[in-house]
A protein has these predicted regions:
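GST-like domain detector, emphasizing the conserved glutathione-binding G-site
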Residues: 1-121
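Non-transmembrane alpha-helical segments in soluble domains
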Residues: 69, 73, 89-92, 138, ...
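Surface-exposed helix-capping loop/turn segments at secondary-structure junctions
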Residues: 78, 143-152, 194-200
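GST-like fold's C-terminal all-alpha helical module
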Residues: 95-185
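Short coil/turn segments at secondary-structure boundaries
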Residues: 107, 200-203
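C-terminal end-helix/capping segment
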Residues: 178-199
């Protein structure tokens, strides 16, 4: 049976997990890994020490969320239509950029002060760039996302909703998060899909 190594907050792990659930990959198990402290179980299958990592029954390990999502779709009895379409890939890439900027903001805070809540890093040139990426990226996602979900969730939908949820999780009181009415409506419309309901991030 395949085992997904993840943590409870990583947006990249959530994208992979959501894709596996939506594709109905059978017999999936989940193992929580600590990527911040060189978890031996994680390092044994992924020398980069990053989540997500999917370990197949034969021991083959697949790292990185987009590659896991691609594998999940290949294993589905009903592959998600359009996942290789340029528009889907473009929107998914934009969402990944938002996720990466959010994660790198937290990493920067950790490096500067050792505290995720300390916002001193955010005022640095790199911190401001990360903030701009999140703000502009969410606004563009709101403009470009297909707000009508299909029977299967495409990669753009999974990545965009994950990006919105992750920014809200990590920056709950931020006044710089733009209004995203279309993306927020899509999140509400898909909230009870197992792919999102069963992967909800928490601190």
């Amino acid at each position: 049976m395949p085992t997904l190594l993840k943590n409870n907050t990583s947006p990249f792990a959530r994208i992979a997990h959501a894709a596996l659930i939506d594709a109905a990959v059978p017999d999936l198990t989940v193992q929580i890994a600590d990527q911040w402290n060189d978890d031996p179980a994680l390092l044994a299958v992924n020398s980069a020490g990053r989540v997500p990592c999917l370990v197949l029954a034969d021991g083959t390990a697949i790292a990185e969320c987009l590659l896991i999502a691609r594998y999940a779709d290949s294993m589905s009895a009903k592959p998600s239509p359009g996942n290789d379409a340029p528009q889907i890939l473009s929107v998914a890439g934009l969402a990944l950029g938002v996720c990466d900027a959010a994660v790198q903001t937290l990493v920067g805070r950790k490096i500067v002060s050792g505290n995720f809540a300390d916002i001193a890093f955010d005022a640095s040139p790199i911190g401001r760039k990360r903030r701009r990426t999140m703000v502009d990226g969410l606004a563009e996602l709101d403009a470009r996302i297909n707000a009508t979900p299909g029977e299967r969730l495409d990669l753009a939908t999974i990545a965009a909703v994950t990006a919105l949820d992750y920014v809200a999780l990590r920056f709950p009181d931020a006044d710089w998060i733009p209004d995203t009415p279309r993306l927020t409506a899509l999140r509400a419309a898909t909230a009870e899909r197992p792919a999102f309901r069963d992967t909800w991030p928490f601190l």
